[in-house]
């Protein structure tokens, strides 16, 4: 956000505000929600909006010098799915076979249980790398190896989540560090590095990073 008159950066700490959620009044306010609704993912919008008609603080308040104060808001509409390049061997390079459908990933695998954590890059992004102290914006799907039952998924709603890397399962954190934004990964975690009851199969899209909130 910039001051429309001076060009001064107004965003707190000079950082963009990362908003994760629906394009509605609660998340963005009525005016910005109206502007972004219907726009395509990947778009950048430049929006000028008035704040008041008060005179600038350094200009005498006369009828001829009265200025409209306002701000210029730059909005990047981030993708809600990984946008990287397909890896040379999407399937066959690890224990998981993954098919993507509109409702989310479908995972199959053989009988051989992985002896440790595994990572298969399904899509390789070209964005910034994930750092150890980041928050990350992700779509994810988690199922049990033994029964294949879905345990958690953001694909149910299509709305990504912002999570703190330091609060993820201990086995998952090191597998995400240095991965690039835009990547889609197929991961397996053994019980002692996950929730303790079963090996987990995880599909995760890395959509954005931000300094930890």
Language model: regions and residue ranges:
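Cross-family detector of peptidyl-prolyl cis-trans isomerase
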Residues: 1-213
């Amino acid at each position: 956000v910039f001051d429309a008159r001076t060009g001064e950066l107004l965003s707190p700490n000079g950082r963009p505000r990362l908003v994760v959620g629906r394009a509605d009044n609660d998340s963005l306010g009525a005016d910005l929600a109206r502007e972004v609704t219907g726009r395509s993912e990947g778009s950048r919008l430049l929006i000028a909006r008035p704040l008041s008609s008060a005179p600038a603080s350094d200009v005498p308040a006369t009828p001829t010098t009265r200025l409209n104060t306002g701000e210029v808001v730059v909005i990047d509409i981030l993708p809600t799915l990984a946008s990287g390049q397909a890896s040379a061997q999407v399937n066959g390079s690890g224990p998981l076979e993954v098919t993507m459908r509109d409702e989310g990933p479908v995972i199959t695998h053989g009988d051989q249980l992985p002896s440790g954590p595994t990572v298969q890059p399904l899509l390789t992004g070209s964005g910034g790398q994930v750092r150890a102290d980041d928050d990350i914006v992700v779509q994810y799907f988690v199922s049990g190896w033994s029964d294949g039952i879905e345990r958690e998924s953001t694909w149910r709603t299509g709305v990504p989540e912002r999570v703190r890397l330091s609060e993820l399962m201990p086995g998952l954190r090191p597998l995400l560090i240095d991965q690039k934004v835009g990547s889609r990964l197929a991961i397996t975690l053994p019980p002692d590095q996950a929730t303790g009851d079963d090996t987990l199969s995880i599909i995760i899209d890395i959509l954005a990073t931000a300094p930890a909130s």
